[in-house]
A protein has these predicted regions:
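Conserved short loop/turn motifs at secondary-structure junctions
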Residues: 16-21, 101-110, 122-125, 155-164, ...
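Glycine-rich phosphate/pyrophosphate-binding loops
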Residues: 128-134, 145, 150-153, 337-340
Length: 450
């Protein structure tokens, strides 16, 4: 990591401006952001339409969505096509063709790792990755609890494992059975799939004592500490509870040659959702009218509702989404996600607006230099492979000097080549509203460590 940073950062100072940095992980993260920006800029939206029919059953209105014809799904790509379909349907009788009742399972979550904690805290609490780690560190190091003294409320916060100790398993089992009953205790625990990239040096992030419920410590914790502890506590307890089960009701309604769909559901057994709903939980809205339909139901047509849409470009990365993408591609480690994002934001390579990360002109310039002169280093596959090699060094399987011998000569050549061939890039300084007393021009903003 030092080789990459110490070798390339001075080059960025020389070719762009002082105060910049490159790094084995941060430069790949920046490239991921720039690649997404390019996808967004190159995106060409396409038009499509959907259509609903508002029907009435026993004086109660409900909505069904256009699906297609008897052969299968039909995509509506323009208003002219939509109008033809409506013309063919308008005099048809709407009738129930098929009804399917069933159930659907929503699996209990697995305990937090560093990355999933950062992602969920970003989505649910609006915390940055750095704020999440700072508060988690406080909870880990210890807080004053009345009658208990200073105790660490959570386990170690830098981990990629979902493993839980036998002692904690026994404690949470006793808690769930005592507070919610045997029916809520999971009979089978699902853990994260094993991976060669998982180090498994530490347990999952969980409360050190599950009997210390969020309500018990709320009055003794600052607001942000309480909110994160509550998230961790609920996630862990929920991970040892049964799955939630939805009762589902799906109906196909025919109109001439065309088919409409309607569905509704309700929670049959709440399971883990009794205490925990994450930011991705769907909202269940039960439509009792749809649930009461049968094949003999007489339906009355009320109106069509037409909606024009355009396909959307890929979304900008949020901190949570970037952490997830880095983890999926094997870039970085639990200890590096937050510092990496903090660095590229602090260097003004990206800005953050309403959770979204946007690449700046400076970030694009740095990324272009890295892609042009150091394409190997900002390659995601190379970086992921290097993580594996470093793990092997830690495990004593490879001598660290061997990796250095294989890597450094190529890096040295790339730096020398870039020094000779790359042109200097001019990036305009960001002006402030302050006027210089000596020359009368606007002062420029300079970013430093403080």
């Amino acid at each position: 990591d030092r080789m990459v940073g110490y070798s390339i950062s001075p080059l960025l100072w020389m070719k762009i401006k002082r105060g910049l940095s490159a790094g084995r992980v941060q430069s790949v993260a920046l490239r991921m952001l720039c690649d997404r920006e390019e996808e967004i800029n190159a995106f060409i939206p396409k038009e499509y339409w959907d259509m609903d029919a508002v029907l009435k059953y026993k004086n109660k209105e409900f909505t069904v969505s256009f699906y297609g014809d008897k052969k299968g799904k039909v995509e509506i790509t323009g208003k002219e096509q939509l109008d033809k379909i409506i013309e063919q349907i308008k005099d048809s009788k709407f009738s129930v063709n098929d009804i399917k009742k069933g159930n659907r399972t929503r699996k209990a979550p697995i305990p937090f790792t560093t990355s999933t904690m950062q992602q969920e805290a970003s989505k649910a609490l609006n915390f940055s990755t750095q704020k999440t780690m700072r508060i988690a560190q406080q909870l880990y190091e210890g807080v004053e609890i009345k009658g208990r003294g200073s105790i660490g409320l959570i386990t170690y916060l830098r981990t990629d494992s979902t493993r839980v100790s036998e002692t904690a398993e026994a404690q949470v089992k006793e808690f769930i059975e005592g507070n919610y009953g045997d029916d809520y205790m999971a009979t089978e625990i699902v853990s994260k799939k094993s991976s060669k990239k998982i180090q498994d040096a530490h347990e999952a992030i969980r409360p050190t004592d599950v009997s210390l419920t969020p309500d018990m410590v709320k009055a003794q914790l600052p607001r942000d500490q309480f909110r994160l502890y509550q998230l961790i506590w609920k996630r862990f307890v929920a991970s040892r509870m049964k799955n939630a089960v939805y009762d589902t009701f799906n109906v196909k309604i025919g109109a001439g040659e065309y088919v409409f769909n309607a569905s509704t559901s309700k929670i049959g057994f709440d399971g883990f959702m009794k205490i925990y709903t994450d930011s991705d939980n769907e909202k269940v809205v039960t439509n009792n009218t749809i649930a009461k339909l049968d094949k003999d139901s007489e339906l009355e047509f009320v109106k069509f509702e037409e909606n024009q849409h355009f396909t959307q470009p890929p979304a900008h990365f949020t901190e949570a989404a970037l952490v997830k993408a880095m983890e999926e591609q094997g870039i970085g480690r639990p200890s590096t996600y937050a510092p990496t994002i903090g660095t590229i934001v602090g260097r003004r390579y990206v800005t953050k607006e309403k959770k979204n990360l946007y690449v700046t002109e400076l970030g694009e310039a740095v990324n272009n230099v890295m892609k042009t002169a150091f394409s190997v280093i900002v390659d995601t596959e190379f970086t992921a492979n290097m993580e594996s090699l470093l793990d092997s060094v830690e495990e004593g399987k490879i001598e660290w000097k061997t990796i250095i011998r294989n890597f450094y000569p190529d890096l040295e050549l790339m730096v020398k080549d870039a020094e000779q061939k790359l042109e200097k890039i001019q990036i305009a300084d960001e002006e402030s509203d302050e006027i210089c007393e000596e020359c009368g021009r606007r002062m420029v903003i300079k970013y430093g460590p403080h």
